[in-house]
């Protein structure tokens, strides 16, 4: 009779620890780019909607990821990823 192979892969962190670490990283980054009262209100909204649940945790992670992505994409001045409109010369060319 065949037996299932023993787990020989690398040790992995439990999923909940990893999720909490991701949330902490997102919070640190969000505080650098958004007003604290605004983030506090977002957290209150999530807590009111989901309570103290894993669904609430997943929701706040998803929302913070989306907000930070959009913020960087439209041109955060703290980042090199954003779209910064280039100035054009009088004739419309970008040559010097």
Swiss-Prot record:
Annotated coiled-coil segments of the chain: none
Chain residue ranges for the region called Homooligomerization: 1-42
Membrane-spanning parts: none
Keyword Protein biosynthesis attached: no
Keywords (A to Z) from UniProt: Activator, AIDS, Apoptosis, Cell cycle, Host G2/M cell cycle arrest by virus, Host nucleus, Host-virus interaction, Ion channel, Ion transport, Modulation of host cell cycle by virus, Phosphoprotein, Transcription, Transcription regulation, Transport, Viral penetration into host nucleus, Virion, Virus entry into host cell
InterPro entries given in the database record: RetroV_VpR/X
GO biological process, one term: protein homooligomerization
PTM per Swiss-Prot/TrEMBL: Phosphorylated on several residues by host. These phosphorylations regulate VPR activity for the nuclear import of the HIV-1 pre-integration complex.
PTM-bearing positions, type Phosphoserine: 79, 94, 96
Gene3D superfamilies: 6.10.210.10, VpR/VpX protein, C-terminal domain
Principal subcellular localization: virion
Locations listed in the record: Virion; Host nucleus; Host extracellular space
One GO cellular component term noted in the UniProt record for this chain: host cell
Further remark: HIV-1 lineages are divided in three main groups, M (for Major), O (for Outlier), and N (for New, or Non-M, Non-O). The vast majority of strains found worldwide belong to the group M. Group O seems to be endemic to and largely confined to Cameroon and neighboring countries in West Central Africa, where these viruses represent a small minority of HIV-1 strains. The group N is represented by a limited number of isolates from Cameroonian persons. The group M is further subdivided in 9 clades or subtypes (A to D, F to H, J and K).
Function: During virus replication, may deplete host UNG protein, and incude G2-M cell cycle arrest. Acts by targeting specific host proteins for degradation by the 26S proteasome, through association with the cellular CUL4A-DDB1 E3 ligase complex by direct interaction with host VPRPB/DCAF-1. Cell cycle arrest reportedly occurs within hours of infection and is not blocked by antiviral agents, suggesting that it is initiated by the VPR carried into the virion. Additionally, VPR induces apoptosis in a cell cycle dependent manner suggesting that these two effects are mechanistically linked. During virus entry, plays a role in the transport of the viral pre-integration (PIC) complex to the host nucleus. This function is crucial for viral infection of non-dividing macrophages. May act directly at the nuclear pore complex, by binding nucleoporins phenylalanine-glycine (FG)-repeat regions.
Recorded family membership: Belongs to the HIV-1 VPR protein family.
Assembly with partners or alone: Homooligomer, may form homodimer. Interacts with p6-gag region of the Pr55 Gag precursor protein through a (Leu-X-X)4 motif near the C-terminus of the P6gag protein. Interacts with host UNG. May interact with host RAD23A/HHR23A. Interacts with host VPRBP/DCAF1, leading to hijack the CUL4A-RBX1-DDB1-DCAF1/VPRBP complex, mediating ubiquitination of host proteins such as TERT and ZGPAT and arrest of the cell cycle in G2 phase.
Name by which UniProt lists this protein: Protein Vpr
Organism: Human immunodeficiency virus type 1 group M subtype K (isolate 96CM-MP535) (HIV-1)
């Amino acid at each position: 009779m065949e037996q299932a192979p023993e787990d020989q892969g690398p040790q992995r962190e439990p999923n909940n620890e990893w999720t909490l670490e991701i949330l902490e990283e997102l919070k640190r980054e969000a505080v650098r780019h958004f007003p604290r009262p605004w983030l506090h209100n977002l957290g209150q909204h999530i807590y009111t909607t989901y309570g103290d649940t894993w669904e609430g945790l997943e929701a706040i992670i998803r929302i913070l990821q989306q907000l930070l992505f959009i913020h960087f994409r439209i041109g955060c001045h703290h980042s090199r990823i954003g779209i910064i409109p280039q100035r054009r010369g009088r004739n419309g060319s970008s040559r010097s």
